[in-house]
């Protein structure tokens, strides 16, 4: 039964990822006043299938100088971790109900750094290595703020379990009292998933595509799938944390529709940001985090710790 549940989770994720690539190309197309893909199938709807067939039927070339084992393991690890992170997400019922779901998510996103590092190192190409080092530095840096923002939200929720956040937000979304945290969280998720304007790992002008420069065909497609699965997962996580949908046990479908709609809108906002903003310079990226976000999130975390203690002495206002 568990295997069926697992498949019923993984297959829709991969389908969502496939069509997200199409949505991205369409959104970017219309924002640049052009059509986007519209040849394969009606309105270009079969484009992702054509892309998948093309990528997976190509010969996976391996450079002679590369470390073969690590070169092949890296993309598989990237996709495995990207899919594993979906297990504790309540939609409205998680695949595995974990007591420490949030901690599990953080641990998995930290492990994702290794797949990037290995892919850059195993390629034995200077561009791939520079891209991987940039990606690792960026991902590790932004995880610091993500962890602190999560801690602040969990202080309001009072539990590490993700379903508890649904209960916390029955009366009000957490984005309303803690909107500065939500804004910083959104920007940090952009940086964490290596999306524009923080896609310095893939700086075409200087790095020829970054850590996946030596990958072609299937392994490249695995990295691609992992990246987009992470984007959708991060937006779902944002929805759970700050835009909690109302859950009525008698009508769980309503929760799922509400939840999916919010996550979709957030994902489209990722694409909107990509179409609107130019790429950051690397020092600006690091400056934004260490000089601006980190002090602010620490201050807000202290605020979230002290507020319940201060207000605990006030008698209930009935």
UniProtKB/Swiss-Prot annotation:
Main subcellular location of this protein, as a coarse class: mitochondrion
Tagged with keyword Nuclease: no
Catalytic EC class: translocase
A GO-annotated cellular component: mitochondrial inner membrane
Superkingdom, natural source: Eukaryota
Membrane topology, from the record: Multi-pass membrane protein
InterPro entries: NADH_UbQ_OxRdtase_su1/FPO (IPR001694), NADH_UbQ_OxRdtase_su1_CS (IPR018086)
Catalytic activity: a ubiquinone + NADH + 5 H(+)(in) = a ubiquinol + NAD(+) + 4 H(+)(out)
Compartments reported by the entry: Mitochondrion inner membrane
Record-listed E.C. numbers: 7.1.1.2
Alphabetized Pfam families for the sequence: NADHdh
Keywords for the protein's UniProt record, in alphabetical order: Electron transport, Membrane, Mitochondrion, Mitochondrion inner membrane, NAD, Respiratory chain, Translocase, Transmembrane, Transmembrane helix, Transport, Ubiquinone
One MF term in the entry's GO annotations: NADH dehydrogenase (ubiquinone) activity
A single GO BP: aerobic respiration
PANTHER family membership: NADH DEHYDROGENASE SUBUNIT 1, NADH-UBIQUINONE OXIDOREDUCTASE CHAIN 1
Job description of the protein: Core subunit of the mitochondrial membrane respiratory chain NADH dehydrogenase (Complex I) that is believed to belong to the minimal assembly required for catalysis. Complex I functions in the transfer of electrons from NADH to the respiratory chain. The immediate electron acceptor for the enzyme is believed to be ubiquinone.
Family, as annotated: Belongs to the complex I subunit 1 family.
Protein name stated in the entry: NADH-ubiquinone oxidoreductase chain 1
């Amino acid at each position: 039964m568990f295997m069926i549940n697992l498949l019923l989770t993984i297959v829709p994720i991969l389908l969502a990822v496939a069509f997200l690539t199409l949505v991205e190309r369409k959104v970017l197309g219309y924002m640049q006043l052009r059509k986007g893909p519209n040849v394969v199938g009606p309105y270009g709807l079969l484009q992702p299938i054509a892309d998948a067939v093309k990528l997976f039927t190509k010969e996976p070339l391996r450079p002679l100088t590369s470390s073969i084992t690590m070169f092949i393991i890296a993309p598989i690890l990237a996709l495995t971790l990207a899919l594993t992170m979906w297990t504790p997400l309540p939609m409205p019922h998680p695949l595995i109900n974990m007591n420490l779901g949030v901690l599990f998510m953080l641990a998995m996103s930290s492990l994702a750094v290794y797949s990037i590092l290995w892919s850059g190192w195993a390629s034995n190409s200077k561009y791939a290595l520079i891209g991987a080092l940039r990606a690792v530095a960026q991902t590790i840096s932004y995880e610091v703020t993500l962890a602190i923002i999560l801690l602040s939200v969990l202080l309001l929720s009072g539990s590490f379990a993700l379903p508890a956040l649904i209960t916390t937000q029955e009366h009000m979304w957490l984005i309303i009292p803690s909107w500065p945290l939500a804004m910083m969280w959104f920007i940090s998720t952009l940086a964490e998933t290596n999306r524009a304007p923080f896609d310095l790992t893939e700086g075409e002008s200087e790095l020829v595509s970054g850590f996946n420069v030596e990958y072609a065909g299937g392994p490249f497609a695995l990295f691609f799938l992992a990246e987009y699965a992470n984007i959708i997962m991060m937006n779902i996580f944002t929805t759970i944390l700050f835009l909690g949908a109302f859950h009525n046990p008698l009508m769980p479908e309503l929760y799922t529709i509400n939840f999916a709609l919010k996550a979709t809108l957030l994902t489209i906002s990722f694409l909107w940001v990509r179409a609107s903003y130019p790429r950051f310079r690397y020092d600006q990226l690091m400056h934004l985090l260490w000089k601006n976000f980190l002090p602010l999130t620490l201050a807000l975390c202290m605020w979230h710790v002290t507020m319940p203690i201060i207000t605990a002495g006030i008698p209930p206002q009935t």
